[in-house]
Amino acid sequence: MTDLQHNLFLLTFDDKLGNAPPNDKDAKVGRVLDVGTGTGIWCVDFGDEHPEAEILGVDLSATFPEFTPPNVRFEVDDIEEPWTYSRKFDYIHSRMMNGCINDWEVYAKKCYNNLNPGGWVEFIETPLKPQSDDGTLPADSQVLKIAELIQEASEKGGHPTLPVENFKDLLSRAGFVDIKVLKYKWPTNTWPKDQLYKEIGAWSHENIVSGWDALSLAILTRAHGWTREEVVVSNALCRKEFKDKSIHAYWPMYSIYGRKPEKADSEDSE
């Protein structure tokens, strides 16, 4: 999670860090887990907003900030391994993890089992492929082609992408109740007429363009045998599409959250 992307989420969510009730300004929150914390900026912001909370951010790589609020700490951890936290949480925040999880059913149940009764989980996810509502994104789009190849490589590597439309049922099967689904749009550039979406599009464009080259180079050369030169040509075509304001494309961004019942059923082992 980059700081740029974090600020894009703040703009999308009307300056809130998430949509589940623990993100309300006056909410009194206990223990919080941020999965895939990246630079840790979400944890730092949440810790500043909720000084009464105890926040733990976990990630596979240690790119954590040097200075943090006293109620925030970080750990290098692999969430695919059994969870061994000594105490349960009141809010689990999981953002942009699609393509990073081996088994979403297992992951959702781990979240359930590691929440206190009445605790909340929130998954914030988007599909890799953009879409359009007016047919201006051509079926032979280079961006769609590369997104499909990246998705194939992720699945071959044991990290399948779950369709965002399936997350509500995923939480329900895990035992969560009061599930809400909120849908937003991240335009590929400043094509929208609406001023807010135009601003979101500007940030969204910078977010995808800044990371596209590295993402596509690693996956296309390793998983699909492309040459570096082929990737460079492809990326130029993708950047051209990302900039094209006649293509009214966007990524649907979903916030799905649910509550663990106050009287939860007996829990499985991790």
Each PLM stretch: what is its role?
Residues I101-D103:
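Short N-terminal helix/helix-N-cap motif within the alpha/beta-hydrolase-1
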Residues D26-R87, Y91, V106:
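Class I SAM-dependent methyltransferase SAM/SAH-binding core
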Residues A174-E270:
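C-terminal lobe and adjacent flexible extensions of AdoMet/dcAdoMet transferase-like proteins
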Residues W120-D213:
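Conserved catalytic/acceptor-binding region of the Class I
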Residues E105-W120:
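A short glycine-rich, Lys/Arg-flanked "PGG" loop and its adjoining helix->strand segment in the class I
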Residues M1-R31, I41, D45:
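Conserved alpha-helix/loop element of class I SAM-dependent methyltransferases that forms part
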Residues D14-P22, G40-C43, D59-A62, V76-E80, ...:
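Eukaryotic intrinsically disordered and solvent-exposed regulatory patches
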Residues S94-N98, I124:
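Residues lining the SAM
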